[in-house]
Amino acid sequence: MSDYFSKLKEHVVESTEINGCTPSIATATFNAPYEVARKTKMLGVTDSSLLNLPAWKRLQSLYEKYGNDSILSHFEKDHQRFQRYSIEIDLHSDDNFLFLDYSKSHINDEIKDALVALAEERGVRAFAKAMFDGQRVNSTENRAVLHVALRNRSNRPIIVDGKDVMSDVNNVLAQMKDFTERVRSGEWKGQTGKSIYNIVNIGIGGSDLGPVMVTEALKPFSKRDLHCFFVSNVDGTHMAEVLKQVNLEETIFIIASKTFTTQETLTNAMSARNALMSYLKENGISTDGAVAKHFVALSTNTEKVREFGIDTVNMFAFWDWVGGRYSVWSAIGLSVMLSIGYDNFVEFLTGAHVMDNHFASTPTEQNLPMMLALVGIWYNNFFGSETQAVLPYDQYLWRLPAYLQQLDMESNGKGVTKKSGAVAVQTGPIVFGEAGTNGQHAFYQLIHQGTKIIPCDFIGCVQTQNRVGDHHRTLMSNFFAQTEALMVGKNAEEVRQELVKSGMSGDAIENMIPHKTFTGSRPSNSILVNALTPRALGAIIAMYEHKVLVQGAIWGINSYDQWGVELGKVLAKSILPQLKSGNIVSDHDGSTNGLINMFNTRAHL
């Protein structure tokens, strides 16, 4: 293994020197295996089973053979490349579809076949079937992983511990329907007899990112006089600013916490309850039963919900086989249903169900989430690409990058395999992004001309929800231009001719050429839907969920736990009393002691 990468590094450095590139770029890229080994050494014995697979070794040799080929050269050899390296899914609704073009990547038929073989050798399909069948694929917590059951519109039986879970799923969905229709119609009244016009969702992580993203994305389908707010940060500013915007007599607070013990969520919930009670008392209004009229819970802890004052009739359940970052399809999506209504929420579920069926039944080479994942494996593990940009060219999707950041990084940000050995390769990428065209004026410079290869997912719509002049054509012209520019680039001779035409000459031209040259061959996927409807959004999210599954299965990690978020939370619980006391501390490391003591001596809380 080490000999292979040493030779490969030498080969690429020599090649890039010939092509005029900086050798250090190639050197940095191919130090990746050594970095993985160094960082995971403390975790114990390395699990090298992935590296020994025939398909993995085949991909290593194919990278050495084709890694320096330009993407454009593939198009020159194959005029049907776009058709052969794209996949379209019918969403079974009007003219809507979901389309993936992955032709602008360093992929040819040999590489594609090897990637497909890798998925087969790693048992991806068997793992996916086990998840769909309700087996306990979350190995470290011994739990099933069944977000697919939440959008199982076929109602096929899904058995967990001998019980079909679909009855419970449908009962909660019916409960959500009844509640949201009462609120949306004005039937539900607050303490002073007024209807509800403000919804404040209090949650964090998956209890916040999903509902925020979906309500923003589906705003054209929302009830416009019902205003949704989201409070997640334990920073009191977040709650304070929301409370300034709502009339408490017309507000319902949704407390989203499975255990009803989450520190950030319960802190915010108690502040909201205190604000309501203070308001009512200050205005001479009875507080009896007020919490039950202005608070509902998304939880499984009946006792804690009752203690808080919430009527347990208005407690919406979900189950331990629903992970937080996969929970927007569950009762956690109550704020979404309040915003867009029951029928549109069912459409949202249906879009995901269509993608589930496609993923479960379609051969790998025509399977959209599979190929999206395999292209990502190719760049992450063979090109050394550590990041993934998500670039939605639709303003309604402006929160999608943050949502996918949690989905991907919390799921696959793991350094240990399910066999409890240290991983031998890079796992989950760093995910970031911004709505187009804003990102073009922020970080695209690095994507085009920086020293890192950053695979990009461009996401756009054929139809716009808002026909304003030529705005949509202008937006999509940028979408298509950016994907082309990343691939094609601009060579030195093209730059020289442009500079001559501009009136520049001599050394000035030669000095400027390197600054205006684009190497090209920067990879991108293009993902299109006809229109951003609830069904289309459901399909997009499910596509990325299954992409995460495929990559996690190949890396041999558990994509469904999140132990990495625990340590800091535990330490925070021990530090909080120290901040409340204001005393000088000495039981942490030198830096942490210094920070706490500086805070305690200067804070005036």
UniProtKB/Swiss-Prot annotation:
Name this protein carries in UniProt: Glucose-6-phosphate isomerase
Reactions catalysed according to its record: alpha-D-glucose 6-phosphate = beta-D-fructose 6-phosphate
Gene name of the encoded protein: PGI
Keywords from the named record: Cytoplasm, Gluconeogenesis, Glycolysis, Isomerase
Metabolic or biological pathway, per its Swiss-Prot or TrEMBL entry: Carbohydrate degradation; glycolysis; D-glyceraldehyde 3-phosphate and glycerone phosphate from D-glucose: step 2/4
Pfam families reported in the protein's UniProt record: PGI
Record keyword Repeat present: no
Source species, domain of life: Eukaryota
Subcellular location field: Cytoplasm
Family from the record: Belongs to the GPI family.
Species whose genome carries this gene: Leishmania mexicana
Gene Ontology biological process terms, A to Z: gluconeogenesis; glucose 6-phosphate metabolic process; glycolytic process
List of catalytic residues: 410, 441, 569
InterPro entries hit by this protein: G6P_Isomerase, G6P_Isomerase_C, Phosphoglucose_isomerase_CS, SIS_dom_sf, SIS_PGI_1, SIS_PGI_2
